[in-house]
Amino acid sequence: MKDIETLRKELSELDLKIIELVHRRQVLSEEVGAIKREKGRPTRDYQREKLVIELAKSHAKELGVDPSMVVDLMQLLIQSSLKTQESARVKEEGQGNGKRVLVIGGLGRMGAWFAEFMSMQGYEVHIADINLDKEDDSHFINWANTNDDYDITVIATPLRQSIEILEKILETGRRGMLFDIASIKSPIKEILSKISEKGMKVTSIHPMFGPDTDLLTGKHVVFMNLDDHGTHLEIMKLHDFKMLSLIHI
């Protein structure tokens, strides 16, 4: 009989091989994703996912392995593959090209999500947040102290703070496009309309998902048309990927 240390060594070797196989699977998944993008196919293929799960479940039963555990494992692998493919699609189809974005509230959970999302698309992202400890060339404690030379300004702060920011913008003006992500629109609808009436490019969106979302397939984003500049259409282009459903109101 083998001693426990020998058995543990064999287990460790198997663990490393499993990780190597996961890496190989990720590489193959990236290649599949590239073909999907080239042929204009959506990231997610539910029929293929079902086939993968059923094959894994069947093989698990043949080996006497708990099928539910194997299904959980395969779902994790599928999610990881989809995330890899989505990230590649966002980067490839992104429209940033070095344009500048200011995310007000960029240390918050949704603010950080948008900062990363837009950075992936090639935007130069700056962050303004009152919770910053110190400032540098791309991080600011007070958004009002930033230069007004951003192509896009994102307001990703709590509602009360968003109202204060929008009131200040109404007073001082803001170049470039502007949008907020508040989930409740009624308290800010009037001030957004006033901002639009002053000729600024403004829209309002509501992501129908939370900051923990790293897989956009099947998710929805609501867009409000607030001005005559087609700002909502321009901002929609930032999210115009095959995995997202865009709702225009």
Q: Which sequence ranges carry the predicted segments?
A:
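Extended, charge-rich alpha-helical interface modules
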Residues: 1-95
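Rossmann-fold NAD(P) dinucleotide-binding segment
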Residues: 156-191
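Conserved small/polar residues in nucleotide/adenosyl-binding loops
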Residues: 247-249
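Hydrophobic/small residue at the entry helix of a nucleotide-binding pocket
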Residues: 110
